[in-house]
C-alpha cells in the first residue's frame, strides 16, 4: 500500500483524528466524509478497531504501509520497554517528524518535503531521507541557502510552543531532540496496544 497523497482533511474526518495537529480538519465536520454524513458511523468489529487504530497512527506520521510494517518489525527486536511505545519512539525519531516537532514545518507532510528538497542538515551535513533516524543530541538545522525560504520562516513564526523533549534556537533556525519523549508527551489519542494486536495477527 502506497502513501496516501489525497486531501488530509478527508482522511482526518474518516479517522476522526487531526493529521495536521491543528484540528482544523474536524472543526466544522467531525464525521466521516460521504453521502450519509454523521449518520454513517457504524460499530466496528475487534479487527476493525485494530485496523482503524493502525491507520490513525500510520497517517499521523504519513508513512507508507510497507515502511510502517517494517518499522514495527524493527520495534519487536528492541530489548526492554513496551513494544507499542518502542514502535512510537521509532516513528518519533524520523527526521521529518523531528523537523515538524521543532516547528520548522507546519505539518509532517511539509517537513517531509523540506527534507526531500535538501533544506535540512543533520550535524552540518545535508540529509534528504525523511526516514533518517535522529539520535538525541544531533543538531538539526536549515541549510544556509534555505534560511530565507518563506515557508520555513512562516512555520517558525506560526509555532506557538514546542514539546519539552526538543530545544530550538529561532535565530539560528536549529535545534535538537534533547531526549526521547515520555508516553504522555506524544499522541495521547492513540491506543498503540491495538496496533500491536493488529500486527501480532498479521506477522
From Swiss-Prot:
The keyword Ribosomal protein applies. The keyword rRNA-binding applies. Disulfide bonds: none annotated. SUPFAM superfamilies: Alpha-L RNA-binding motif. Pfam families: Ribosomal_S4, S4. CDD domains: S4. GO terms for cellular component: small ribosomal subunit. One of its GO terms (molecular function) is structural constituent of ribosome. Residues 93-156 form the S4 RNA-binding domain. Keywords: Ribonucleoprotein, Ribosomal protein, RNA-binding, rRNA-binding. One of its GO terms (biological process) is translation. NCBIfam families: PRK05327.1, rpsD_bact. Part of the 30S ribosomal subunit. Contacts protein S5. The interaction surface between S4 and S5 is involved in control of translational fidelity. Belongs to the universal ribosomal protein uS4 family. One of the primary rRNA binding proteins, it binds directly to 16S rRNA where it nucleates assembly of the body of the 30S subunit. With S5 and S12 plays an important role in translational accuracy. This is Small ribosomal subunit protein uS4. The gene is rpsD.
Amino acid at each position: 500500500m502506497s502513501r496516501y497523497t489525497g486531501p488530509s482533511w478527508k482522511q482526518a474526518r474518516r479517522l476522526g483524528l487531526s493529521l495536521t495537529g491543528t484540528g482544523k480538519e474536524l472543526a466544522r465536520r467531525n464525521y466521516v466524509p460521504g453521502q450519509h454524513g454523521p449518520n454513517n458511523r457504524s460499530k466496528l468489529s475487534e479487527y476493525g478497531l485494530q485496523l482503524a487504530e493502525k491507520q490513525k497512527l500510520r497517517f499521523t506520521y504519513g508513512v507508507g504501509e510497507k515502511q510502517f510494517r517494517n518499522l514495527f518489525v524493527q520495534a519487536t527486536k528492541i530489548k526492554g520497554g513496551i513494544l507499542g511505545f518502542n514502535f512510537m519512539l521509532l516513528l518519533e525519531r524520523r527526521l521529518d517528524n523531528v523537523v515538524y516537532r521543532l516547528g520548522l514545518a507546519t505539518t509532517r507532510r511539509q517537513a517531509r518535503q523540506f527534507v526531500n528538497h535538501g533544506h535540512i542538515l543533520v550535524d552540518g551535513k545535508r540529509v534528504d531521507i525523511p526516514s533518517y533516524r535522529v539520535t538525541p543530541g544531533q543538531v538539526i538545522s536549515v541549510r544556509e541557502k534555505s534560511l530565507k525560504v518563506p515557508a520555513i520562516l512562516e512555520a517558525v513564526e506560526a509555532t506557538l510552543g514546542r514539546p519539552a523533549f526538543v530545544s530550538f534556537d529561532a535565530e539560528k533556525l536549529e535545534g535538537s531532540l534533547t531526549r526521547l519523549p515520555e508516553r504522555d508527551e506524544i499522541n495521547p489519542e492513540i491506543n498503540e496496544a491495538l496496533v500491536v494486536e493488529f500486527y501480532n495477527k498479521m506477522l
